[in-house]
Amino acid sequence: KIKKVLLKSFINGALVSESNENVETFFKIKIEANNTKIFYFENSSLKFEQDFEFGTDIILRDISKITLLKKDTIKKILDQVSLNNQIPEDELVDKNFFINDNYRKIKKKLIYEIILARVIEISEIIVFKNVNLQYSTKSLKHIFLELNNEFKHQNLKEIFENTFFIKGF
């Protein structure tokens, strides 16, 4: 006879709560290459879980479409160039990033703005305009973001964190 069923999502939420001063009500957002999951915990109970069929690759594809850069070049730029809203308008990506690619004059600010626009859109879809979560976003103070292992670029993480912070978390 089965007495209890524990979901992996619930256990992960318990670990997040325990490692963050026993916070009881929060969102956990896990963003992987091709999918995103959101978990809503209220009073230490898993209340809601939803999957989305997009992830960090959508950001790389957007940058690639607009700038015509290859994925490897984009990843190098994200790893080595500081991208934020303080970038001068005329500052270009350095030539040393174009090893297997022809050099193009691409503004760092453009790459930042592409990322920011997509991150804002992602945040709205999964949290702020998600009809399944409208009642829970009003009083929520904690959100925990996990990016996939392959895509741990500090720039992207900071843009995600700043976007959620600006929206009220």
Ranges and model annotations:
Residues L15, N34, L147-N148:
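Glycine-centered small-residue hotspots that permit tight backbone geometry or close packing
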Residues E18-E49, I63:
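Gly/Thr-rich phosphate-binding beta-strand-loop-beta motif of the actin/hexokinase/Hsp70
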Residues A14, L60, K157:
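Generic structural marker for isolated residues within well-ordered, non-membrane alpha-helices
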Residues F144-F169:
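Charge-rich, low-complexity intrinsically disordered segments
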Residues F10, F41-E124, K138, L145-H153:
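Phosphate-binding glycine-rich/basic clefts of nucleotide- and phosphate-handling proteins
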Residues K1, I122, V127-K129:
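Conserved phosphate-binding loops in N-terminal lobes of ATP-dependent enzymes
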